[in-house]
């Protein structure tokens, strides 16, 4: 069976990617990161999801939190803002996060003989993060095949971003068709220890709108009653 490394945050998109990779016949090696994120409940969710969905293995890598300063997701002194339409890169951007995560996934993949890496990046219904754009994914794939023994020898890597051009509605519809239990997932940028969502941040807003527009019951547990 072919192997794939799947970046698994515990959120909606990465869980959909895990389900999709499994449906394509991959033995999935889930990889999560503890990097000082305030929404650490997502790591508990990732553990539940990996077990529930039958991942071949699940590793949680602890990174030095000093690598990720200056973000509302890692610095308690910076407030996570409520959702607001804006073309600007928000304060929830974590410096070079996907680059670092993919680099770790690449090393792991080469070491276990996997040549496919899955990431839940999307350039639709997102917060203008530069490391979610298709040109970033394409560039990293080129780098992967220039920087590794396997790549140089022609055993090439593929960086799979299957949600790249899907809206949140489409991602939810796809996951629902694949049998994903979204009640296990945590997407909120500031979920409490119980995994209950704030309902106000960018991630919560995109998620709520997605379920509503998809006509799928929202299984998210919220900290308080909120409205779009």
Swiss-Prot record:
Annotated coiled-coil positions are none
Q: In which pathway does it act?
A: Purine metabolism; 7-cyano-7-deazaguanine biosynthesis
Q: Where does ATP bind?
A: 8-18
* Textual note on the cofactor: Binds 1 zinc ion per subunit.
The processes (GO biological process) annotated in the record are:
queuosine biosynthetic process
Q: Which cofactor does it need?
A: Zn(2+)
Which residue ranges run through the membrane?
Answer: none
Q: Which molecular-function annotations from GO does this UniProt entry contain? A: ATP binding; ligase activity, forming carbon-nitrogen bonds; zinc ion binding
Is Methyltransferase one of the keywords UniProt gives this record?
no
Q: What is its EC number?
A: 6.3.4.20
| Keywords for this protein | ATP-binding, Ligase, Metal-binding, Nucleotide-binding, Queuosine biosynthesis, Zinc
Q: Which domain of life is it from?
A: Bacteria
The free-text function statement in the UniProt record for this protein reads: Catalyzes the ATP-dependent conversion of 7-carboxy-7-deazaguanine (CDG) to 7-cyano-7-deazaguanine (preQ(0)).
The entry's protein name is 7-cyano-7-deazaguanine synthase
This protein's gene is called: queC
